[in-house]
Design a protein with these regions (language model features):
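Short, Lys/Arg-enriched N-terminal segments with co-localized hydrophobic residues
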Residues: 1-6
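Hydrophobic membrane-insertion alpha-helices, especially the h-region
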Residues: 15-28
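Membrane-interface motif at the C-terminal end of an N-terminal transmembrane signal
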Residues: 25-39
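Terminal accessory/anchoring regions of large secretory-pathway or extracellular enzymes
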Residues: 39-86, 92-95, 113, 351-530
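Solvent-exposed N-terminal domain segments of exported/luminal and surface proteins
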Residues: 50, 55-211
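A contiguous, surface-exposed recognition patch within enzymatic or periplasmic domains that forms
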Residues: 87, 180-182, 194, 273, ...
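Extended, loop-rich substrate-binding clefts of extracytoplasmic carbohydrate-active enzymes
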Residues: 197-255, 371-382, 386, 390
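Acidic, contiguous internal or C-terminal segments within carbohydrate-active enzymes
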Residues: 237-286
């Protein structure tokens, strides 16, 4: 999709955002060059007699790929596959019994995605068994094409668009879908009793930059066949784009919270203006604090409702998501961040009233850096949207130091897909943010705004009444004209009321509950746009 959004200064920019898949056009000759490179590299590092696979071979391959000019994937699919609509594409299903791990009593199974519709790029997928690499070959006989009438004779050399892994996640008797890799460098996963929502990506390049965003692709995959008692499965992915190449290792462990241990080695081809590490992509259409109202019977529609940050100083920040008229870019400057993620905090089905989408069952995702990431900032991009089919929220870590050629970048992190946050934190979750006209009933002040914030802090009624627990509020622009903290008899927690008088400029507001000089809640961080 091309989004034309009007910035505050009325300058129009064109912002390219990938919502479901990257469609990268190329030429067949270019794809042949990659295949030649691939075969040469495999022959050089992997097919020496009696030499078994090790991950270092793939690192060498990624570095060699980055040293060569970028070759875009080919656009050589039959028209009948390109023209498939959403429902027609979904009608093509992989037959489970054709999976390479089916019937082997392994803890995981592989199933594949067919090419077609938005997914036009063939991705080689390999299996590693006892240290040997085996290509997983495509056959149209592996798929049920449903009501589609396709000439499968022309599809024999097609290849796959991506894959998914299944695991007895919710019951021992059934292999549930656990994780999928499909489109560009997108992937997503599930914990127990969750439904797909937000996604992650391997790398983000120049997001929300006027020159346009670049979407790296996973060029090839290697999956290590697990043993019968293994609790985890390992996937290697070769990343490629005009600006960089890299090798990614994913060690995936299913459970109540599914965990991915990610190791990313990135080799820039050129200087990159803005590099996004550990990007997360989600959807927020409207919710409790949305000023841009929708004519919709549902109270809320979103896959995530806030950004949670644990910065290098140990502060917990909560930024409620919004869908305004303007492109919003927020930067949380930090050094060695301890974690960040997009959360679906509201789990009440009555707040969504959508018993097909089940937004209350969407997973949250938390990025936990391993080692020091240095100086930089966590960036949040919120894009105006009118439909829930569009992912319009992106967050990632931006290193302060520019990525330059011939300098390898190495990032490790643990990525949790969860319902309940898997790390220890301060109490005082911010559970809701409401906003509206300032003043009180009968004395409204339309030049002011009122914010109401619910804190999940229990057993604090006496401390609030005695002034031991207080509310601290600040605004970078405008004026805080009133603040009040009270016990909430309905939630049994605390509720804050803030009156804010804007001055026509963008303002960063902060609020927290403080006791004896220390925060006993998350810090509410809110960006006000005129």
């Amino acid at each position: 999709q091309f989004w034309k959004v009007k910035m505050k200064n009325t300058v129009k920019i064109t912002f390219w955002i990938m919502l479901t898949a990257a469609v990268v056009l190329g030429i067949n000759a270019g794809w042949d060059k990659y295949q030649e490179f691939r075969q040469a590299e495999l022959a050089r590092v992997m097919t020496v007699k009696d030499k078994k696979f090790d991950p270092g071979q793939l690192t060498e391959m990624a570095a060699a790929l980055a040293a060569k000019p970028y070759v875009p994937p080919a656009d050589n699919l039959p028209d009948e596959l390109k023209k498939l609509n959403y429902d027609q594409y979904r009608d093509i299903r992989f037959s489970r019994e054709n999976g390479p791990w089916y019937g082997k009593k392994l803890p995981f199974e592989i199933q594949f995605f067919h090419l077609g519709s938005l997914f036009l790029t063939s991705v080689p997928i390999n299996e590693i068994v006892n240290g040997r690499i085996h290509p997983l070959k495509y056959s149209p006989a592996y798929f049920d094409y449903g009501k589609n009438r396709l000439n499968t004779d022309e599809l024999s050399e097609l290849g796959y668009a991506g894959f998914r892994l299944h695991n007895p996640l919710n019951t021992r008797k059934y292999y549930d879908e656990l994780v999928s890799f499909l489109g560009a460098s997108y992937f997503r996963a599930l914990g127990k009793h969750q439904k797909y929502g937000l996604s992650a990506r391997g790398l983000a390049i120049d997001t929300a930059v006027q020159t346009g965003e670049e979407f790296p692709i996973f060029r090839e995959f290697w999956l290590v066949r697990p043993k019968r008692n293994d609790k985890s499965v390992t996937v290697y992915a070769l990343l490629d784009s005009p600006s960089a190449a890299g090798i990614y290792t994913f060690v995936i462990t299913p459970g109540e919270n599914t965990v991915m241990d990610v190791d990313a080695k990135i080799f820039p081809r050129k200087e990159i203006n803005k590099l996004g590490i550990a990007p997360l992509t989600s959807m927020y259409l409207f919710g409790e604090n949305t000023k841009n109202k929708f004519d919709d019977h549902r109270p809320e529609v979103h896959d995530s409702d806030g950004l949670l940050v644990l910065n290098g100083n140990g502060e917990w920040l909560w930024r409620p998501l919004d869908n305004s008229k303007y492109l919003r870019i927020s930067a949380f400057v930090d050094e060695n961040p301890k974690g960040f993620g997009l959360l679906q905090r509201d789990r009440d089905p009555a707040h969504y009233l959508d018993f097909e989408a089940n937004y209350e069952q969407r997973p949250s995702a938390w990025v936990e850096p391993v080692g020091d990431w240095g100086k930089g900032w966590i960036e949040l991009v919120e894009i105006p949207s009118q439909q829930e089919i569009h992912d319009n929220v992106v967050t990632y870590w931006v290193p302060k130091e520019k990525a330059v050629p011939q300098k390898e970048l190495h990032y490790r992190y643990r990525l949790y897909w969860f319902t309940k946050l898997p790390v220890k934190k301060v109490p005082g979750d911010i559970t809701a943010t409401y906003t509206g006209i300032g003043g009180v009933s009968g004395m409204l002040e339309d030049h002011k705004r009122k914010f109401v914030i619910d804190f999940d802090i229990l057993n604090m009624q006496k401390e609030v009444e005695k002034g031991i627990a207080t509310l601290e509020v600040s605004a970078s622009e405008g004026e805080i004209t009133g603040k009040h903290l009270m016990y909430n008899p309905v939630t049994k927690g605390l509720t804050a009321y803030i009156d804010f008088k804007p001055n026509g400029k963008t303002s960063e507001l902060r609020a927290s509950v403080v006791k004896k000089g220390k925060n006993i809640s998350e810090i509410w961080s809110y960006q006000w746009l005129p």
